[in-house]
Amino acid sequence: MASIAIENAEPVPSDCKGDLKISKFDGDLPLKVLYCGVCSLPTEYCEYMPDVAKCRQWLEKNFPDEFSKLTLGISPKQETGTVEGQATSGEEEEKKKQKRGGRGQIKQKKKTVPQKVTIAKIPRAKKKYVTRVCGLATFEIELKDAQRFFAQKFSCGASVTGEDEIIIQGDFTDDIIDVIQEKWPEVDDDSIEDLGEVKK
């Protein structure tokens, strides 16, 4: 129905405010768009990205003629100041960020902490106790998995409370040493220390 209304509509004079003008494109179709190798956007949009300096360096290195076209509007003082000022920080960021297919960011080694598991019995209310196990993370044991294992093994509540601490509800100081050695053989008898009853 809408197409019929358009065909039957009378021509509108050009001096009307609601007149639509259709402009014709003079360039060749399809358009050839140059995409940036850093941000993967068309090079005209690189200026809106946070790492403009990297985009400019890439464009200057790979397409110097396009780079000169884009930098015509920028005064020489602005261009050199921005590129030099951000180039040093851009290079540092480039080292940190992982590139496609690259090695990625090098993880810093953790400080060598002595591998020791400590077990303590902490009094709670009246005659109730909780058992605290610390140091399992030094043996690269996942604390969440260990917490689940202890809760299942002793049929009680267990939770990861600290960076390297598991609290088990109940007094299991006698059994837990054997259970740890049985489950994780890399934890030997010398590296487990029983602190006995400790106050919070």
Swiss-Prot record:
Database matches in InterPro entries: DENR/SUI1_TIF, DENR_C, DENR_eukaryotes, DENR_N, SUI1, SUI1_dom_sf
Bias type Basic residues, positions: 97-112
SUPFAM superfamilies linked: eIF1-like (SSF55159)
Region described as Disordered: 78-112
Alphabetically ordered keywords of this record: Initiation factor, Protein biosynthesis
Annotated SUI1 domain residues: 117-184
PROSITE patterns attached to this UniProt entry: SUI1 (PS50296)
Biased composition (Polar residues): 78-89
GO MF annotation terms: translation initiation factor activity
Pfam families in the record: DENR_N (PF21023), SUI1 (PF01253)
Family the UniProt entry places it in: Belongs to the DENR family.
Function comment: May be involved in the translation of target mRNAs by scanning and recognition of the initiation codon. Involved in translation initiation; promotes recruitment of aminoacetyled initiator tRNA to P site of 40S ribosomes. Can promote release of deacylated tRNA and mRNA from recycled 40S subunits following ABCE1-mediated dissociation of post-termination ribosomal complexes into subunits.
Protein name: Density-regulated protein
